[in-house]
Swiss-Prot record:
It comes from the Eukaryota. The keyword Nucleus applies. One of its GO terms (biological process) is ubiquitin-dependent protein catabolic process. This is Proteasome subunit alpha type-4. CDD domains: proteasome_alpha_type_4 (cd03752). It holds the Pfam family Proteasome. The lineage of its organism: Eukaryota, Viridiplantae, Streptophyta, Embryophyta, Tracheophyta. Keywords: Cytoplasm, Nucleus, Proteasome.
Length: 249
């Protein structure tokens, strides 16, 4: 039945479904997991890296975490070439807003603008939708710390804690069970690592397979900080999710 209606993004099935958009969401389900948790003093993003190699230049490459502006960052799951286009679009929009109004772009306004672009690609004939989902973490003076999730359809929503990528439903269920409204940033890191350790396909959790980033306030200014492999390893040991190396012990 679907073959009659999935050749173009502009054709609805009799059930009102856009199959090309659903196929894009299937691609995200095969990508590495990413988890975002909003706390009272920051937002934490943790992602599972699928590409791991000793030859990879980790200092210049990132698979899951990207800084958009000084006050906004994102985690991605899906087709990375699609993600790069949208991330660059978001960066340009944020800089244009800052240039025009001399203040940072509100987080939700930036997310909505990018999602308008994503939604447009579900209406153009001959163009596939973007096969990528995002978790946006940010802070602005109006609403403080915020976490948004968007999917290939262009839909977005604000969340206290959210998961995208492989096994996202299991991760979402665990977050719903363990999340507290008064959670701190340190507790959010521990929770995100715990959830990811139980939903990843890999049997062992190491810094080579993870990326972690935080958005928080430091001396009254918003700061984006990507966690180094060494610090991430110490966090995993502290959480009891991995054994200390011979050098550390």
């Amino acid at each position: 039945m679907s073959r009659r209606y999935d050749s173009r993004t502009t054709i609805f099935s009799p059930e009102g479904r856009l199959y090309q958009v659903e196929y894009a969401m299937e691609a995200i389900g095969n990508a590495g997991s990413a988890i975002g948790i909003s706390s009272k003093d920051g937002v934490v993003l943790v992602g599972e890296k699928k590409v791991t190699s000793k030859l990879l230049q980790t200092s210049t490459s990132s698979e899951k975490m990207y800084k958009i502006d000084d006050h906004v960052a994102c985690a991605v799951a899906g087709i990375m070439s699609d993600a790069n286009i949208l991330i660059n679009t978001a960066r340009v929009q944020a800089q244009r807003y800052t240039f025009s109004y001399q203040e940072p772009m509100p987080v939700e306004q930036l997310v909505q603008s990018l999602c308008d672009t994503k939604q447009g690609y579900t209406q153009y004939g001959g163009l596939p939708p973007f096969g990528v989902s995002f978790l946006f973490a940010g802070w602005d003076k109006n609403f403080g710390f915020q976490l948004f999730m968007s999917d290939p359809s262009g839909n977005y929503a604000g969340w206290k804690a959210a998961a995208i990528g492989a096994n996202n439903q299991a991760a979402q269920s665990m977050l719903k069970q363990d999340y507290k409204d008064d959670i701190t940033r340190e507790e959010a890191v521990q929770l995100a690592l715990k959830v990811l350790s139980k939903t990843m396909d890999s049997t062992s959790l190491t810094s080579e397979k993870l990326e972690l980033a935080e958005v928080f306030l430091s001396n009254g200014k918003v700061k984006y900080q990507a966690c180094s492999p060494e610090k991430l390893n110490s966090m995993l040991v502290k959480s009891g999710l991995t054994q200390p190396s011979a050098e550390e012990s």
